[in-house]
Amino acid sequence: MKMPVHLNALRAFEASARHQSFSAAAAELNVTPAAVGQLVRSLEDWLGTPLFHRASSGRVRLVATEAAEHALPDIRAGFDRLSLGLERLKEESNGGVLTVTVSPAFAAKWLLPRIESFHAAWPDMDVRLDTNLRTVDFLAQRIDIGVRYGPGSWPGLVAEKLMDEEVYPVCSPKLLMDTARLQTPDDLARETLIHDLSMDSHMDFPTWAAWVGKLGLAGVATSRGMKINNSAAVLQAAIDGQGVALARSVMARDDLAAGRLVRLFPQIRFESPLAYYVVYRPGCSSLPRLMAFRDWLFETAAK
């Protein structure tokens, strides 16, 4: 049986199945929901079988049929191979665009202050940063490589540990102009605690409650204080003297070195169970452009 050209229809089907929504698939593919629905219906007509169970009400309106679910891994693998083939064509030249996904805070506090050295080594390569807290689909969003913070396991991606992390209290030097202030951890009971909520939903993400609990500080109320969902903004609030932040060492490194922040109680160690990982799709390790950035990340992190 001759295979007709149905790549757009297959892409619409795969995205609709992943999102369980024509509207969400349309947003990803930059077309209208009606166009996605038409592409899926054309594929169903050609196959002679429905690909989705459609509901008129409820939270999920679109569920792939059993046959469609069985076919999806092969279809996704096929798109991955096509994407990799295009990447190999790009490698005919050292130029092009490398798309890198990182969190907004990691971009601001670690990557951007250091990336000039990568541009100096690879002047013909442009880097496009996709800053996002959510877990993006590398294939659908055309992501080449990224740095993720977490336990080190993400389906469909190679993950190589880049950096471990420690957490500790920090504050502005101006808070310590009163020499009697913040002499012991118990003194935190009289300070505004700045909370990092950027990964609050992850049970292993270090929090003030975990840090205070480890020390058994009964008088420190960890439910109060300033709550911010961006690690860079957490540090900026501390720099501005708004209170004491529980800083992530990778994010706070430059601010500590520049004297904008001071680490409190350095004798207390609290290692995060999470770490930073370089992530990319399997099979991409042979792409020189991508591996150049990967190697630069590891060389820079080791300094």
Model-derived features: positions:
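C-terminal regulatory
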Residues: 140, 154-271, 302-303
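Central regulatory/effector-binding core of bacterial HTH transcription factors
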Residues: 95-158
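Helix-turn-helix DNA-binding elements, focusing on the entry/boundary residues of the two helices
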Residues: 21-22, 40, 54, 234
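Short helix-boundary/capping micro-motifs
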Residues: 15-30
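Short helix-loop hinge/linker segments at domain boundaries
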Residues: 55-62, 69, 79-101
